[in-house]
Amino acid sequence: MPFVPVRDGKSLYVRVVGRGQPVLMLPGLGMHSVHWLPFILPYLNKFRFYLPDFRGFGKSAHIRLNQADVFHNHMEDVQDIIAYFHLHDFLLAGISLGGSTALHLNKEFGLHGVRRYLHIDQSPCVGNRPDWNHGLFGHRQDELFGQMHRLGDLLDEHTALTHIGEMPLSARREAAATLAEIAAGMTGKPLLKPVLRQLLISPGQLTRWLPLSRVDDCRAYLRAYVGGGHDYRHALRQCPVPVTVMVGMKSPLYAPAGQMAIADYAPDARIIRFHKSGHVPLMDEPLKFVRELGLFLNGPVRG
């Protein structure tokens, strides 16, 4: 399994499995390359999968973000992966953060060398705008972004620390309360708040349950998302490849209407609705995901 040199001199881990046409799959926030394996297993004889661990996660956990724009940072790493493996005529897939990274690549440089793109449960515009209310958290964005701002302010007071679990108890209590509010708001389950508040006070539980446990990484992602991110909608009009969009119709993070609006921008888009799924269709409807992934890999029958 190679560690790929990237432009800042670090080495990013990329798991490579299978044989055949190349497929580059970009992970969501906190996801490890190994999480893809059960779903790609049926296709290893026809496709060669390149599965990176993004900076800060999996076997790339030791690599820090090196710029304020996390989306641009990950995009540059993806460019370096493509160049290192000499990928061309390849399939590209991205879920959540990986989807934003792929759309960032399309906006900045285009999807050159990509034959088809699979986009999984991510809005083409994370921040709400006067003409767009389908960003992260939808109509509750101001409320939940306010809580994320408070968490960011708290972390700004502890930049000398490495991990959130190292913060003083009073600060951990405040962070846990804010995280519990955010989680309850995301899921629509207010009864979770007292449970999560107590659970997350423990340093060990903070590290175990949070996808981001480092202070610097958490601050970077909070800034990226609360800042509104990027608007990738209009760049999709020039997207040169067919796009398949997998939508969790019960997604608590991104309104299905906003995800499906990709078809209003991309010249060649196909929408796949996962009616029983939230933000992670591969976990909520795994059999359907494997089946639809196969259709994407082999080229969907369009009609």
Regions found by a protein language model. Name each.
Residues 35-37, 60-66, 129-131, 256-257:
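Conserved catalytic-core motifs of eukaryotic protein kinase domains, centered on the activation segment
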Residues 1-23, 44-48, 83, 87-88, ...:
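Alpha/beta-hydrolase fold catalytic core
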Residues 88-131:
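Conserved hydrolase catalytic core segment
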Residues 188-264, 270-273:
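Conserved serine/cysteine hydrolase catalytic core
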Residues 274-290:
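Catalytic histidine-centered segment of alpha/beta-hydrolase-like enzymes
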Residues 115-168:
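Flexible "cap/lid" loop of the alpha/beta hydrolase fold
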Residues 10-63:
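Conserved HGGG/HGGXW glycine-rich cap/lid loop of the alpha/beta-hydrolase fold
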Residues 7, 41, 51-97, 106-108, ...:
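Active-site loop/oxyanion-hole signature of alpha/beta-hydrolase fold enzymes
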